[in-house]
């Protein structure tokens, strides 16, 4: 039960529901921001977490899928989860690289290699689901629906 809870929490860690205004197209035509752009913004928030914890938390939370927010919310609970192990190993990461491994109409998966702040290397799989943007329903958004637990390895991003 505890493992299931942590897996669900880790899934939500990667998730966020709304897209920041700088990315949303507020015009009348529907648009979708590419998932790799959203992933880059999310990972930048992890990378710079200590420099701007509230802004980073807001970005990560806002890209969470609504189903994950139901499980890991409210936001204060999510923050506490993010600051605890194993999720805290993602915060203030030094480097990362990612490759798209699965692409369907509604889901995209990325393999992400990370150099953590403690100089450990690990890999996670990040899963996005296409859904309506909560703050701008005319647009679709790639929202984090799952993140696997870190899998450690020897070296290299």
Listing of model-derived features with the role each one plays in the protein:
Residues 5-14:
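Sec-dependent N-terminal signal peptides
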């Amino acid at each position: 039960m505890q493992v299931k809870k942590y897996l669900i929490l880790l899934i939500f860690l990667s998730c966020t529901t709304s897209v920041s205004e700088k990315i949303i197209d507020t015009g009348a035509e529907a648009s979708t921001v590419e998932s790799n752009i959203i992933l880059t913004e999310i990972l930048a928030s992890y990378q710079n977490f200590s420099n701007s914890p509230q802004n980073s938390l807001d970005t990560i939370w806002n890209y969470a899928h609504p189903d994950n927010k139901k499980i890991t919310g409210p936001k204060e609970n999510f923050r506490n989860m993010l600051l605890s192990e194993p999720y805290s190993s993602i915060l203030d990461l030094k480097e990362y690289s990612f490759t798209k491994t699965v692409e369907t109409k509604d889901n995209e998966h990325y393999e992400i290699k990370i150099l953590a702040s403690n100089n450990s290397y690990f890999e996670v799989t990040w899963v996005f689901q296409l859904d309506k943007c909560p703050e701008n329903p005319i647009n679709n958004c790639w929202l984090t629906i799952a993140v696997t637990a870190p899998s450690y390895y020897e070296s290299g991003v």
